[in-house]
Amino acid sequence: MNFDEIIDRRGTHSQKWDMMEPNYGVPADDGIPMWVADMDFRPPDCVTQALRRMTDHGIYGYYGDDTGYRAAIRWWMETRHGWRIEPDWIFTTHGLVNGTAMCVDAFTDPGDAVVLFTPVYHAFARVIKAAGREVRECPLNMADGHYEMDFEAYEAAMTGSERMLILC
């Protein structure tokens, strides 16, 4: 992978670059699009090759279960984190926002509060509010150029209605 290669993605239907001006009034030439986790470097060759093998087949129907996919996740969790997980614990969603919305719906009730340490990805608050839950913000402190949790402020902000905390 080459992290030094500059790839201009403007005008390529890139939400990150092409939606900055319509969404925020900032032309792509004048801003740094830090509002979405979308990378501007090419993926590893093995990923590109795997995708090409799939598209070369020429049929794009619904994708079924892939035991290799689940095995890779299980290997990663055990190797990197010492956590042995079962294949049926793995539930794939179509993106972070969908997965977050599903968790908010599954683990909280309307009116419950969900804690967010801010600044954080803006879509989390939108998902929480859309589900009829309350966003409980706990601002992070900026110290020596990095963010730190303020545990005293966190404890002071809690009212007892919180049922979920999202760390990002």
Residue ranges and their predicted role:
Residues 2-95, 102:
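N-terminal small-domain helix-loop-helix segment of the aminotransferase-like
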